[in-house]
Amino acid sequence: MASDGRPRVLILGGGFAGVGAAQKLQKADAEVVLVDRHDYHTFQPLLYQLATGLLETTAVGHSLRDLLSRHKNTVVHKAQVKAVDLEERRAEFDEIGPLSYDYLVFGLGAEVNFFGTAGAPAHAFPMYTLPHAARLKDHLLERWEAADRDPSLIEDGALNVVVVGGGPTGIETAGAIAELYRGDFLKDYPGVAPEDARVTLVEAGPELFPMFKPKLREYADEALTLRGVEVKTGAAVASVEPTRVALKSGETLPAHTLVWGAGLQGNPLVQSLGLELQRGNRVGVGADLTLPGYPEVYVVGDVAAITDAKTEQVLPQLGSVALQSGEHAGESIAHRVAGKQPKPFEYKDKGTMATIGRGAAVVQMLGGKTMTGKKAQAAWGAVHLALLPTNEDRAKAVVDWAGAAFTHQRVGRITVEAD
């Protein structure tokens, strides 16, 4: 409880779920404390656009303090959570010490799951955090600059990219890198031929987009091929080295870049809570998103295994799921503080979607309706613009997207190095 007698709501994590919870608590008669190891919120669905120069860092990363600056009942701390004691209702932090709580919103997200693949943690480029995307952007530019200085590197696969994962993250990333290569880079580096810079998408399963209808999978495959992406299904990665990728089939792909978009697992802190975890290190929750046995604890976002009441399926780790679950937690706590009865969580499906490149996208709604092409890309843009936290961010994204579409010029195409 806060020093003034108000209940304290502790929000762990400043992602979609944490920020969504804080926004719904803005007018609650409570002290709201949001803690994240970073001082910024990351818009994860657009990280691949940062990595390929379609958007600037400021369009993907947003100051948490700025986002919540109008919340008079909210404070933000930059700190790393060490432990959570569910019985004592207390969280421990290295930087700010212990914090007790009356309500806890556990939204610490996930981390990349390499599935034990040898060499992947050391050599792969994940696509889950702002530093991940910035590091990949600099690496891609550096490889082309290195090959421009020393063309013999091309034969070693310096410009080749392997993208792992046939879901939305992998497909969007592969399509964006292929367009970057076939468009801007081949123009800027005239000594490189298209066949010298290959983009390969590998998926361990028998097909891309297993959650989509066959016609959408076929469309995605054709759109990737049209952009120069080689698609390999039934191709599991055995190991990763700095300059090559070995598949379990025995095939070796020469490549200095491997982007990992193959899966996530819940934040490792959950393993210390003494809970029975579900697949992918995720925490099972009740219909109201509270932790069974702990009605004051809400688990939300990528770390939560939320069963959809309509389909009885566990909801995917998507930005829309994280945001809606966080908003539900914040709204429920605000109701409880005011003496009102909260409602069960009901997910409003925005569709599963991916954009593959300029004018190419796929959308599948919960009821089975599908879209492809420019219409699907417009729907994709509308959904993602709605997820952006401020109108300023939405306007900036539209300007950057429009500039790339009409001029084929990208905004983020320099590397900043130490003098």
Annotate each PLM feature:
Residues 1-6, 74-162, 259:
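FAD-binding core/adjacent interface of flavoenzyme oxidoreductases
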Residues 12, 100-111, 237, 245, ...:
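Short hydrophobic core segments
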Residues 72-87, 178-287, 291-293, 342:
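A Rossmann-like FAD-binding core segment of flavoenzymes
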Residues 122-151, 243-246, 252-324:
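FAD-site-proximal beta/loop scaffold in flavoenzymes
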